[in-house]
Amino acid sequence: MRSYETMYILSPDLSEEERKGLIERFKNLIIENGGEITNFDEWGKRKLAYLIDKKPEGYYVLMNFNSDSKVSQELERVYKITDGVLRYLIIRTDE
C-alpha cells in the first residue's frame, strides 16, 4: 500500500447536507476499496486565489490515506464526474 494525500475544493453553493454527503462518499470510496484514511481535515470555506467557475470561494477538504494505486485512480475518476467539485489534487506521499 502507498500513502496518498488529496485535497479537493467543493462549490460554496452546496447545502451543508450535500457537502457532507459528498465528503462521506469520497471517504467511503477509499474504505470500501481496501484503503484506510490516516488523516482527515475540513479547512472550511476559504477565498480562492482566482475565480473558478465564477466563484470567489470554495470549501476545502484535505485527506491522507493509504491504498493501492487503483483506489487513487478511481477517486480521481469520481472527482472528475462529480458536480460540486471545483478542483482536486491527489499526490503520492511515499518517503
From Swiss-Prot:
Pfam families linked to this entry: Ribosomal_S6
Disulfide bonds: none
Keywords noted in UniProt: Ribonucleoprotein, Ribosomal protein, RNA-binding, rRNA-binding
Gene Ontology process terms (BP): translation
Superkingdom per UniProt: Bacteria
Any one cellular-component term (Gene Ontology): cytoplasm
Molecular function per GO: small ribosomal subunit rRNA binding; structural constituent of ribosome
InterPro entries associated with the record: Ribosomal_bS6, Ribosomal_bS6_sf, Ribosomal_S6_plastid/chlpt, Transl_elong_EF1B/ribsomal_bS6
Keyword rRNA-binding: yes
NCBIfam families per UniProt: S6
The protein's role, per its UniProt record: Binds together with bS18 to 16S ribosomal RNA.
Protein family (similarity comment): Belongs to the bacterial ribosomal protein bS6 family.
Name the UniProt record assigns to this protein: Small ribosomal subunit protein bS6
